[in-house]
Amino acid sequence: MTKYIFVTGGVVSSLGKGITAASLGRLLKNRGLNVTIQKFDPYINVDPGTMSPYQHGEVFVTDDGAETDLDLGHYERFIDINLNKYSNVTTGKIYSSVLQKERRGEYLGGTVQVIPHITNEIKERVYRSGRETNADVVITEIGGTVGDIESLPFLEAIRQIKSDIGRDNVMYIHCTLIPYLKAAGEMKTKPTQHSVKELRSLGIQPNIIVVRTEMPVSQDMKDKLALFCDIDTKAVIEARDADTLYAVPLSLQEQNMDQIVCDHLKLDNPAADMTEWTALVNKVRNLSKKTKIALVGKYVELQDAYISVVEALRHAGYSFDTDVEVKWVNAEHVTAENVKELVGDTDGILVPGGFGDRGVEGKIVAIQYARENKVPFLGICLGMQLASIEFARNVLGLEGANSSEINPDTPYAIIDLLPEQKDVEDLGGTLRLGLYPCKLAEETNAYNAYNEPVVYERHRHRYEFNNQFRPDMEKEGFVFSGTSPDGRLVEIIELKDHPWFVAAQFHPELVSRPNRPQPLFHDFVRASITNKESK
């Protein structure tokens, strides 16, 4: 029978529930269990696709085209699985589904209420995740903090699941904070006690408490928490700040967290073999070289907006025993006069995806600098579109060349709406989303990176390269190294007379893994290291 683990949070948000859930997933997978994982977000948006990155951070896209929470990126990177649209559920999705059923008359004329209709829908999403993946274990993270009004239906639903399928098949893990008061020189357990009290008042008794802390938690403090929270002392797990995220699974294993989980759920599996993971962490902690990459974006104040990009750069660096330092460059501040000052000390330049016109001209200036000064360059989504526009303006001499997204009246729409997008009115969920094939041209940097004729990558865009400009740009050394199999859509571009200048319409960062870097990032970082060594 499928087992269910629920991860909740208390005291404050951003405690690392997602990392805790992902780390536990890795440990259970390495015990030979088939693990799937999902995130429940209590906001009323249907998905984060139309939310500002400042509100929510990065939008992570799954193979099947779901726009999801950035925690799914952690899940995929840690557990090394590909998730799907059932892996991220919001209040908006739940209510939308219930209202559609009500309109179809599925409730037989009854009054539709939070209990049982909303809670039943939430439970069905939990069970469906297990059914769709044939999982041995389903880990579900509940977003937000215990005490939030928005979370109440989700907490009630997961409370009911224990009654529905039995206590041996359900486990509750609560993540909290033990703050350190510098003035008093003390760590305080009271916030955790109150958070657990709140959770218990809702009918949920946590089986494990994971305490986030800056300082070591003494045995006396663990005993105190165990007493007041009514759990075993061994089930108080310390989650101290780590030097690398990838060390967290090893820390949890040292404290026998996965064994406690297996004992409670009556799973008789051998201990997790973390040899390969330990080697990865040792490598990460002992990188001997450095390279610096400029990330030129418009959301640089909130680095979570580019979290998968940064992780993909790091993964690529691990292959070369190199620590990749990201220099954050605000695209709005970049001008032709100061671009050398802002990016001249870096070994490579990356322009990530985005929407809208803010910061676009600064990104184009940075791309021009990379092209003219032979600096390794990687463009992603909007970065690929702007690389095309920069080339059209400054090599072909097409003054005013632009994207019709940025300037609908441009005389040269190098980037234009996909034909199927022309009549689309809704913004949410209507982009070209998910996994699509890309055919690679031989004897190109793109082909050399993948070493395969056809690859599959995840997309999230509405605009595409305008094919009427292809012949003129090709004559000037602009290479279309990746296209859709029918040749209609441009997927990857690069430059002939440049050490390494590649840009992709898709989002390669979404499939990178710490032990298996994404090929374009791998070769981009290698080119950046070569550039540094040649200076």
UniProtKB/Swiss-Prot annotation:
Protein name: CTP synthase
Protein's UniProt keywords contain rRNA processing: no
HAMAP family per record: PyrG
Any one GO molecular function term: CTP synthase activity
Enzyme Commission number(s) of this protein: 6.3.4.2
Purpose: Catalyzes the ATP-dependent amination of UTP to CTP with either L-glutamine or ammonia as the source of nitrogen. Regulates intracellular CTP levels through interactions with the four ribonucleotide triphosphates.
Matching CDD domains: CTPS_N, GATase1_CTP_Synthase
UniProt KW keywords: ATP-binding, Glutamine amidotransferase, Ligase, Magnesium, Metal-binding, Nucleotide-binding, Pyrimidine biosynthesis
Superkingdom: Bacteria
Pathway: Pyrimidine metabolism; CTP biosynthesis via de novo pathway; CTP from UDP: step 2/2
Residues that coordinate or bind L-glutamine: Y54, G354, L382, G383, M384, Q385, E405, R462
Catalytic activity: UTP + L-glutamine + ATP + H2O = CTP + L-glutamate + ADP + phosphate + 2 H(+); L-glutamine + H2O = L-glutamate + NH4(+); UTP + NH4(+) + ATP = CTP + ADP + phosphate + 2 H(+)
Amino acids binding UTP: S13, K188, T189, K190, P191, T192, Q193, K224
GO BP term, example: CTP biosynthetic process
InterPro entries: Class_I_gatase-like (IPR029062), CTP_synthase (IPR004468), CTP_synthase_N (IPR017456), GATASE (IPR017926), GATase1_CTP_Synthase (IPR033828), P-loop_NTPase (IPR027417)
Miscellaneous comment text of the record: CTPSs have evolved a hybrid strategy for distinguishing between UTP and CTP. The overlapping regions of the product feedback inhibitory and substrate sites recognize a common feature in both compounds, the triphosphate moiety. To differentiate isosteric substrate and product pyrimidine rings, an additional pocket far from the expected kinase/ligase catalytic site, specifically recognizes the cytosine and ribose portions of the product inhibitor.
Region span, Amidoligase domain: 1-267
Organism: Bacillus cereus (strain ATCC 14579 / DSM 31 / CCUG 7414 / JCM 2152 / NBRC 15305 / NCIMB 9373 / NCTC 2599 / NRRL B-3711)
Quaternary data: Homotetramer.
PANTHER family, alphabetized: CTP SYNTHASE, CTP SYNTHASE-RELATED
Residues in Glutamine amidotransferase type-1 domain copies: 292-534
Activity regulation summary: Allosterically activated by GTP, when glutamine is the substrate; GTP has no effect on the reaction when ammonia is the substrate. The allosteric effector GTP functions by stabilizing the protein conformation that binds the tetrahedral intermediate(s) formed during glutamine hydrolysis. Inhibited by the product CTP, via allosteric rather than competitive inhibition.
Positions with a binding annotation for CTP: S13, D148, I149, E150, K188, T189, K190, P191, T192, Q193, K224
UniProt-annotated binding residues for ATP: S14, L15, G16, K17, G18, I19, D71, R240, D241, A242
